[in-house]
Amino acid sequence: MATLSRNLRLSLDTPTSTFVRTKIVCTIGPKTMSEEALIKLIETGMNVCRLNFSHGTHDYHGQVIKNVRSAMEKTGKIIAIMLDTKGPEIRTGKIEDRCGYVDLFVGQEILVDTNMNQPGTSFRISIDYKGLLDSVKVGGYILIADGVISLSITAVEKEKGHVVCRVNNNSRLGENKNVHLPGAIVNLPAVSEKDILDIKFGVEQNVDFIAASFIRKADDVNEIREILGEKGKDIQIISKIENVEGVDNFNEILEVSDGIMVARGDLGVEVQMEKIFVAQKMIVSKCNAAGKPVITATQMLESMIKNPRPTRAEATDVANAVLDGSDCVMLSGETASGDYPYEAVDIMAKICREAELVESSTDYQTLFAALKLSSAKPVSIAETVASYAVATAIDLKADLIITLTETGLTARLVSKYRPSIPIIAVTSWSYTVKHLLATRGAIPFLVESLVGTDKLVESCLEYAMKHNLCKKGSRVVIVSGVMEGVPGKTNSLRVLTVGESIKDLKV
């Protein structure tokens, strides 16, 4: 009923805020790896750049990271870097034709083997799973490229080292495409040797997030944390949920993860098509209840790889991901290899703003009660203060919330209760600044020390007024701790009114 009541009040003429609370993750590829392209993505709205380690060498990714940091320096804006592992997945090999793809036609026969040294043709391709012949059976399927290409298994010829398949649909097969064997028992390690090398490379490069592919259970996350070691202890792990086992074990995975990605591409192949939205809503809602960031990904604006405008369905999909509660929405091929990368980021930001406007029309008391009810018990002092800071901001029609937070926990707890206003998160820890770029509504603000609350608040208000986040007469809610600069001691809530000058504040 709360949704119905909200929707009945909607209008196309409602003015839109200039501030986008939902964060945008952009995959960087050949079209956008240059410093100039990265600067344009940052200025258009990118918050997190994703490096897909299913493709590219360490030298390539190292150059991209160097370019990202140079672009940050030139724009004066901070961007987080996410290393997305290849994971224990199966992929196709190289193609013989110089164009890098072959056309397949419905009804034709094609052989599938595991000889990755031999380039594929329209009659024979390879995949990198050595256990293929022991895992599949006649009557099963091999699904390629997020299930776009479907092959029916007609024979398993172990003595010849290949599987005979029939092509079920006209399609174009490229190199290094993901492969699924639905219904087959696939024995793959949680973390491959390549993943270990890539994660260690990420530690050396000081990346901010590891997006861990094909997480199936909590132990998979713990294994990655061990690989990160002491040197990589500040790198956060975003667990990608992309198979049925990951969905079944989601509660234990969420508990040990720093955040979650709903990787709908592979998940959509493993889960029945009509059930994908159920999985998405369940995962996002559980992340919201836990106060952990969640990214909705895959095919969000897919048509913009080739077209300057998204489909109506895609625009609605992005909006619904925001309304579901996503902290971030992600672009993949749209920005990695598409013809309209900047337009894709721009339209995604516009859709997010509109969806946030709709969300802010929801009866807040109903939302607040639901979030309180779903929170783990007992509730911490920090969460109690954070939740009532948001409730106070709503009641007083405040324009801004300021949190003083070392680890970012207080800011995430405030964000959990979904205020419709910006959250300036003041911290003296540089990695916290990067991590908060995946938290909805958070604007990280780096300072030398959290000692001296009043001066920090003055600095924040100067920044906020400069960026039109508040004005004279605005009410501002401050969340901090009596023990200044001590992590985990959030226990104080204040309300200030911005006066004639920054220093003219009323408590």
UniProtKB/Swiss-Prot annotation:
<feature type="binding site">
    <location>
        <position position="266"/>
    </location>
    <ligand>
        <name>Mg(2+)</name>
    </ligand>
</feature>
<dbReference type="Pfam" id="PF00224">
    <property type="entry name" value="PK"/>
</dbReference>
<keyword id="KW-0418">Kinase</keyword>
<dbReference type="InterPro" id="IPR040442">
    <property type="entry name" value="Pyrv_kinase-like_dom_sf"/>
</dbReference>
<feature type="binding site">
    <location>
        <position position="177"/>
    </location>
    <ligand>
        <name>ATP</name>
    </ligand>
</feature>
<dbReference type="GO" id="GO:0016301">
    <property type="term" value="F:kinase activity"/>
</dbReference>
<feature type="binding site">
    <location>
        <position position="52"/>
    </location>
    <ligand>
        <name>K(+)</name>
    </ligand>
</feature>
<feature type="binding site">
    <location>
        <position position="265"/>
    </location>
    <ligand>
        <name>substrate</name>
    </ligand>
</feature>
<feature type="binding site">
    <location>
        <position position="242"/>
    </location>
    <ligand>
        <name>Mg(2+)</name>
    </ligand>
</feature>
<feature type="binding site">
    <location>
        <position position="266"/>
    </location>
    <ligand>
        <name>substrate</name>
    </ligand>
</feature>
<feature type="binding site">
    <location>
        <position position="298"/>
    </location>
    <ligand>
        <name>substrate</name>
    </ligand>
</feature>
<feature type="binding site">
    <location>
        <position position="91"/>
    </location>
    <ligand>
        <name>ATP</name>
    </ligand>
</feature>
<feature type="binding site">
    <location>
        <position position="84"/>
    </location>
    <ligand>
        <name>K(+)</name>
    </ligand>
</feature>
<dbReference type="Pfam" id="PF02887">
    <property type="entry name" value="PK_C"/>
</dbReference>
<dbReference type="GO" id="GO:0000287">
    <property type="term" value="F:magnesium ion binding"/>
</dbReference>
<keyword id="KW-0067">ATP-binding</keyword>
<comment type="subunit">
    <text>Homotetramer.</text>
</comment>
<dbReference type="GO" id="GO:0030955">
    <property type="term" value="F:potassium ion binding"/>
</dbReference>
<feature type="binding site">
    <location>
        <begin position="52"/>
        <end position="55"/>
    </location>
    <ligand>
        <name>ATP</name>
    </ligand>
</feature>
<dbReference type="InterPro" id="IPR018209">
    <property type="entry name" value="Pyrv_Knase_AS"/>
</dbReference>
<dbReference type="GO" id="GO:0006096">
    <property type="term" value="P:glycolytic process"/>
</dbReference>
<keyword id="KW-0630">Potassium</keyword>
<comment type="pathway">
    <text>Carbohydrate degradation; glycolysis; pyruvate from D-glyceraldehyde 3-phosphate: step 5/5.</text>
</comment>
<comment type="similarity">
    <text>Belongs to the pyruvate kinase family.</text>
</comment>
<keyword id="KW-0670">Pyruvate</keyword>
<dbReference type="InterPro" id="IPR011037">
    <property type="entry name" value="Pyrv_Knase-like_insert_dom_sf"/>
</dbReference>
<keyword id="KW-0808">Transferase</keyword>
<keyword id="KW-0547">Nucleotide-binding</keyword>
<feature type="binding site">
    <location>
        <position position="50"/>
    </location>
    <ligand>
        <name>substrate</name>
    </ligand>
</feature>
<dbReference type="GO" id="GO:0005524">
    <property type="term" value="F:ATP binding"/>
</dbReference>
<dbReference type="InterPro" id="IPR015813">
    <property type="entry name" value="Pyrv/PenolPyrv_kinase-like_dom"/>
</dbReference>
<feature type="binding site">
    <location>
        <position position="54"/>
    </location>
    <ligand>
        <name>K(+)</name>
    </ligand>
</feature>
<feature type="site" description="Transition state stabilizer">
    <location>
        <position position="240"/>
    </location>
</feature>
<keyword id="KW-0479">Metal-binding</keyword>
<dbReference type="InterPro" id="IPR015793">
    <property type="entry name" value="Pyrv_Knase_brl"/>
</dbReference>
<dbReference type="GO" id="GO:0004743">
    <property type="term" value="F:pyruvate kinase activity"/>
</dbReference>
<dbReference type="InterPro" id="IPR036918">
    <property type="entry name" value="Pyrv_Knase_C_sf"/>
</dbReference>
<dbReference type="InterPro" id="IPR001697">
    <property type="entry name" value="Pyr_Knase"/>
</dbReference>
<keyword id="KW-0324">Glycolysis</keyword>
<feature type="binding site">
    <location>
        <position position="85"/>
    </location>
    <ligand>
        <name>K(+)</name>
    </ligand>
</feature>
<dbReference type="InterPro" id="IPR015795">
    <property type="entry name" value="Pyrv_Knase_C"/>
</dbReference>
<dbReference type="GO" id="GO:0005737">
    <property type="term" value="C:cytoplasm"/>
</dbReference>
